[in-house]
């Protein structure tokens, strides 16, 4: 899911089959159920194999409820602010796994695997198989502008700081 129609459009342009626009997110039990139902309705197999969640907070439980049998829920971060509390019985009911993805630790603990991953990504980039979306390039001395732009959720893609 994404927070705006503009971001949904970009996701579809980059190959997403469908996108859920969550706006300000589920703020109570009823809206959380609605969000979960909407996510489930977009799945073609009764739930998702993998959920990539960099947001957390009130989005986590509805997202997890939309996971399919033996799905994996990847905890990437907590951009929405609060660390979520998931009912652990959902893992049992769905035969699902919750996996913490901490790239910083991975790069140090699994150096060779990380090196291979970077080489694979560079190959995809050089072959044109993936194309990063750069929303804006900002001079390094204006880094505060970049931080504010990201903080206001006004970015679609990446902000790149450049040296003059």
Q: Where do the PLM segments sit?
A:
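Short catalytic-loop micro-motif centered on adjacent basic/acidic residues
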Residues: 49-52, 72-75, 132-135
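Adenosine-nucleotide cofactor-binding segment
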Residues: 1-58
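Glycine-rich phosphate-binding loop and adjacent beta-alpha segment
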Residues: 2, 11, 58-129, 162-164
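Short, hinge-like loop/turn segments at secondary-structure boundaries
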Residues: 15-21, 37-38, 90-94, 115-119, ...
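Short conserved AdoMet
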Residues: 44, 68, 154-155
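C-terminal capping/lid region of NAD(P)-dependent oxidoreductase domains
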Residues: 122-123, 127-136, 144-164
């Amino acid at each position: 899911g994404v927070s705006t129609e503009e971001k949904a459009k970009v996701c579809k342009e980059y190959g997403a089959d469908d996108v859920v626009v969550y706006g300000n997110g589920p703020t109570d039990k009823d809206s959380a159920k609605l969000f979960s139902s909407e996510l489930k309705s977009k799945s073609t197999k009764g739930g998702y194999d993998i959920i990539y969640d960099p947001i957390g907070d009130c989005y986590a439980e509805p997202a997890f409820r939309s996971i399919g049998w033996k799905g994996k829920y990847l905890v990437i971060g907590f951009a929405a602010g609060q660390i979520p509390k998931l009912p652990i019985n959902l893992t049992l009911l769905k035969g699902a796994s919750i996996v913490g993805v901490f790239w910083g630790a991975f790069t140090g603990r699994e150096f060779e695997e990380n090196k291979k991953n970077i080489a694979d990504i560079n190959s995809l980039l050089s072959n044109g198989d993936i194309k990063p979306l750069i929303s804006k390039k900002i001079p390094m001395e204006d880094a505060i502008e970049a931080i504010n732009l990201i903080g206001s959720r006004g970015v679609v893609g990446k902000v790149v700081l450049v040296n003059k």
